[in-house]
Amino acid sequence: MLIPLGLSASSPAVPERPVDDTAPLENQEIPVTEKNTYPYVDIHGDYRWLWGRGQFRADSRTAPDKVRRHDERIYLTTRRLRLFPFIHFSEKTSLRTQLEDLRNDKDANADHHLYLGRLYVQHEQARLKVEAGRFNYYLLDGNVIDKKVDGLRLRLGERTTGPGSLTFFAGRTTGSDDRHRLRGWSLLYSSQHGRLKSDAAYLDFRRLQDLPSSRPSLIGQSRAGTGFDEQRIAEWRLMYELTPKLTASLDLLHAWGRHDADGYDTTDSGFVAALTYGHLDERQKGSYEAWIRYYDQPSASILYHTMDGDTTFFRRMGFCGWGARLDYIVQPGLAWAVEGFSLKNRHHTAWTGAFRETVIGTSLTAYF
């Protein structure tokens, strides 16, 4: 993830592999071989090399007739090893863990040597799925949250049968301290009618420790400040399969956010529109998937965005712009991806002018 060191309000954690099958391949669990005798242990994993470049530009007004420009270029090269030891107690119940080792070639202080990043129990049967412990919470396309959490997630029903499925989550996000942790709950309803999929979600989260006042204090009352102590977000995603290979989706967002020390609150709406082409199969050489998205997203609608960029760069101004990604299977078990974003701030303030962020990155991931 590319983050401007001098401009970022916070440092988002490295995204982990979500459980939602709409996530990029490198963030999905690869199917494992089932056995007939229990218990048994299964271990799979991946190794990823990633390179990225980000260009960040911000204009600030020090006086009505004076504009100061800050330009920063960031390069990133990382190597990541992940192991997923699963203990299967029965066909329906398992203990799932993740070990991760991350090396940053540009900044050794950002290295994370082998550690236990995930530990949870999963029980799944017809029309019921329960997860409890530390796992990754990836909601829909990750426009609102893609983050490691400690908590409970319960799903009742199936999207494709009957009235659909209802998923409840309660818990808190992980972080270095209470100012970087959120506690809350969410509810997700999913259904499918032929080629049309519909998902409606509501999230209510609060920071464990309130953020301090934005500095300088003069900007605290505006969108030029940073962060929220409380956020409530409503999300509705419609996805339609135009052809077997082409899918269109529209993600509608409405959010409220408050920063207590700044005495600031906002209610805002936005959307993310996307087209996806192709179907990715890690077992089939030459398979691919490509998407393009247009973002018009308020900052209050973001808890932890999945994109490989820094949405906190835009403070409370929100952002709009384009993103695109291509995933390609070089050979079974080896995937190549390239991704890019061109974004700008959604609003200006009396203290800030144009903010622009351009990010491009590529990765090679081997699965085993």
Tell me what each language-model feature is.
Residues M1-G6:
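Bacterial N-terminal signal peptides
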Residues V14-E26, I30-R73, A108-N109, Q122-A126, ...:
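Outer-membrane beta-barrel pore domains
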Residues R134-P163, P212-T243:
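Short secondary-structure boundary segments
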